[in-house]
A protein has these predicted regions:
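Short active-site-adjacent helix-start/loop capping segments
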Residues: 59-60, 74-80, 115, 131-136
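Gram-negative bacterial Sec-dependent N-terminal signal peptides
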Residues: 1-22
Length: 412
C-alpha cells in the first residue's frame, strides 16, 4: 500500500469530528455500499468498512485494504404547534403554527484500514461517526424556546484485532475511542435582579442561551461470525455503552444586551447495541443480507446540566434538568447485492427504524419518529481499486411530543 495514501486516510480520520453530522442520533451510513444495502452489510468480501459493520468479517480481507467514504445527508422536515386550550368539544378547531426546519446538511465521513497479518490474524482500524445530529429552526419560531439549534458532532476510532479459528468461525475484539462535540442553543426566560431607586426587584428577562463543549470517552466492541456452509452465514456484533462527562461553556445573551457566562457540566451515556445478521448466497453473483439492530436507548433517560461560577450571581439556576426517558428500539434492514461481472455490481436495500422517543421526552434536538429508508447503489472495481455510489431516501414519520406543560401546548 502507498504510505502517503495511508497517511492521508489517517488525517481524514482525525478531521472527521469537524465534519461528521446529520439530523438524527444514530448514524448507519458508514460506506456507499452500506448505504445502498440499507445498512445490511455485515459479510462483504475484501471490504475494509467491515471494521464498522462487522469486525469479525475483516477476516474476509485478503492482504491490505484501505477505504474512505463520504456520505452527504440533507434533512428536511416541518412541524406544527398545537394549543390544547383551543380545542372545542368536537376537537375540530386546532390552532397550529405550521413551519419547517432550516435545511442543515452534513457529511458522514468514514476511513478504514485492514491488514492481514497471517492466515489466522487480522488488524483493522476505522474512524467513523456512530452518533451525530444537526437540527435548526427559526430563532423567532415557537420552537425556539425548546431548541432552535442543536448539533452533536461525533466520531469513533476503533482499533480491532480479528482471528479466524477455522473455515467456519471468526471473531474480533476492539477498543473504541469516542469523541463528541455538543452545541445547544435556545431562547429562554430568566429571573434577573434589577436595581431601582427604591429596591431591588426580580424581573423576567428574555434571552438566548448557548451551551458548547466536547468530551472523549472509551468503549469496546466484540463480534463473531459462523459459516454453516458456502452459502449461509450468521454474525453478531456488540458495541458497549459509552459514558461522557461533558465540561462545557454556558453563555446567555439577554435581549436587553450584555452577556452572562458560567461553567456547565453534564453526564450523558450513549447506548450499547446488538447487531444480528444473516447472509445467503444464491450463487456466485447474488447474495442477500438480513440485519436486526437493538439499541438500548433507555440509557438516554435525561439531559441534566449543572451550572456553576456564573459571571452574574443569583441569576442562573444551579441545575437545568430535562427528562428524556427514551425506550429501547429495533432497526431492521434487508440488502441485496448482484455482481454483473468481475467489475460491476448493483445493490439495493430497505431499512425500518422504530421510534424510541416518548411523548413526554421529545424535543427539537432530535425531532424524528419512525423511519423507512429506501436505497440503491452501484460499484465498479478492479484488482486495485473500488468506486461505489449510492442514493438513499428516508421517510421520517410524525413525532408528537409535549411542549410546555404549564401552557398545555404540544408539537407534531
Amino acid at each position: 500500500m502507498n504510505k502517503n495514501f495511508l497517511a492521508l486516510g489517517l488525517a481524514a480520520a482525525l478531521l472527521a469530528p469537524q465534519v461528521a453530522g446529520a439530523e438524527g442520533f444514530a448514524i448507519n451510513e458508514w460506506s456507499a455500499e452500506g448505504v445502498a444495502m440499507g445498512g445490511a452489510r455485515m459479510f462483504a468480501e475484501d471490504d475494509a468498512a467491515n471494521v464498522a459493520y462487522n469486525p469479525a468479517s475483516i477476516t474476509k480481507v485478503k492482504g491490505e485494504v484501505m477505504k474512505s467514504s463520504y456520505t452527504y445527508l440533507s434533512p428536511h422536515g416541518n412541524y406544527k404547534l398545537y394549543d390544547y386550550k383551543l380545542y372545542d368539544s368536537n376537537n375540530d378547531e386546532i390552532k397550529g403554527e405550521p413551519t419547517h426546519n432550516k435545511v442543515h446538511a452534513g457529511w458522514a465521513v468514514g476511513t478504514y484500514y485492514v491488514r492481514q497479518i497471517n492466515d489466522k490474524e487480522w488488524f483493522g482500524i476505522g474512524a467513523f461517526p456512530r452518533f451525530a445530529m444537526v437540527s435548526e429552526f427559526e430563532r423567532e419560531s415557537k420552537a425556539s424556546s425548546n431548541a432552535f439549534f442543536s448539533k452533536l458532532n461525533g466520531v469513533s476510532v476503533t482499533p480491532t484485532y480479528a482471528h479466524k479459528f477455522d473455515k467456519k468461525w471468526s471473531a474480533a475484539v476492539g477498543a473504541e475511542i469516542n469523541y463528541v462535540g455538543l452545541e445547544l442553543q435556545k431562547n429562554l426566560q430568566m429571573k434577573m435582579p434589577v436595581e431601582t431607586p427604591v429596591e431591588t426587584k426580580i424581573a423576567t428577562i428574555d434571552g438566548t442561551t448557548q451551551i458548547e463543549g466536547e468530551s472523549y470517552a472509551l468503549g469496546w466492541n466484540a463480534a463473531a461470525s459462523y459459516a454453516f456452509d458456502d452459502k449461509n452465514e450468521i454474525g453478531v456484533v456488540y458495541r458497549s455503552r459509552i459514558t461522557h462527562s461533558l465540561e462545557a461553556d454556558f453563555k446567555m445573551y439577554p435581549a436587553s444586551g450584555g452577556k452572562i457566562t458560567a461553567d456547565a457540566y453534564g453526564v450523558v451515556t450513549l447506548p450499547d447495541s446488538w447487531d444480528i445478521g444473516y447472509n445467503h448466497k444464491f450463487d456466485k453473483k447474488t447474495r442477500l443480507e438480513l440485519k436486526a439492530t437493538r439499541t438500548n436507548w433507555s440509557t438516554y433517560d435525561a439531559l441534566n446540566i449543572s451550572l456553576s461560577n456564573p459571571s452574574v450571581p443569583g441569576v442562573l439556576p444551579s441545575n437545568v434538568d430535562s427528562a428524556k426517558n427514551w425506550s429501547n428500539g429495533w432497526r431492521y434492514a434487508i440488502g441485496l447485492e448482484h455482481n454483473f461481472s468481475d467489475k460491476y455490481a448493483a445493490m439495493a436495500g430497505f431499512a425500518f427504524d422504530e421510534a424510541s422517543i416518548p411523548y413526554n421526552g421529545g424535543d427539537f434536538m432530535v425531532p424524528t419518529g419512525l423511519r423507512r429508508t429506501y436505497s440503491i447503489g452501484a460499484r465498479y472495481n478492479d484488482k486495485k481499486q473500488t468506486v461505489a455510489v449510492a442514493l438513499g431516501w428516508m421517510d421520517v414519520g410524525t413525532l408528537d411530543f409535549e411542549g410546555h406543560p404549564e401552557k398545555g401546548d404540544a408539537y407534531s
